[in-house]
Amino acid sequence: MWNLRITPLSFGAACQGIFTSTLLLSCVTVPLVCTIVYDSCLYMDINASRALANVYDLPDDFFPKIDDLVRDAKDALEPYWRSDSIKKHVLIATHFVDLIEDFWQTTQGMHEIAEALRAVIPPTTTPVPQGYLIQHDEAEEIPLGDLFKHQEERIVSFQPDYPITARIHAHLKAYAKINEESLDRARRLLWWHYNCLLWGEANVTNYISRLRTWLSTPERYRGRDAPTIEAITRPIQVAQGGRKTTSGTRKPRGLEPRRRKVKTTVVYGRRRSKSRERRAPTPQRAGSPLPRSSSSHHRSPSPRK
């Protein structure tokens, strides 16, 4: 990696800002293109490719700060560095760790020099509006040697007799802004690659999908807490660690004899006596009255007799 030093001179700081901004654009674009081509053309799953593209849509406050991000990435990459691993995620994450760490220090130095120049800028000087400063998308299409000239022409069009110290201050602010936007893209890619090493590419893909679903759901219809990658991977670890293995072969379920269910009938109401059910019906002619039972003709003897 290049050892970049911030010069104390204002003109040197402006020139170095142009160099670092353009160099950062190329260093971020090359691994980004290599990652997309490598993943899409070879073996990367289509769901993982979509999740990698959806990382750019996540809010800025979702990702940790650059200092914390670099420290966490180094802790995750340390075992792979010891074993000299050449995995895809290891190589790309290592590249972004060095890139982000060096250029973040350079960008902070540019901000410090820009703040120091405020003391020598005349108080009546009007700051350059944001519309006159080169943006990140425009800087990608401008060649390296023409970046300073394009920015200078915009400052002159705003105010021809603009003070030299204020011009250098505007240059530094524009280049630092370009660096920050490039670093934002780089830190999102770094977060993706080193988390794939920690949790697995499939788990990170599932986590991004659930998180985007939670964010797109209205607040009144979603849960209070956002999904976490630890909660997604915890059931898998518990199921693998707590499963008990039984000895012997288990009999297939299809070969077991089926047990016939015994139907039970419930009779509601008064139960008829068996004597009535067994009594044969008496013959009867058509039109004749119903026969009376023999007990109705003869009265039972009185207990007194």
UniProtKB/Swiss-Prot annotation:
It is found in: Secreted. It holds the Pfam family Hepatitis_core. Residues 1-19 form the signal peptide. SUPFAM superfamilies: Hepatitis B viral capsid (hbcag). Residues 226-305 are annotated as: Disordered. InterPro entries: Hepatitis_core, Viral_capsid_core_dom_sf_HBV. The gene is C. GO terms for cellular component: extracellular region. It comes from Duck hepatitis B virus (strain Germany/DHBV-3). This is External core antigen. It comes from the Viruses.
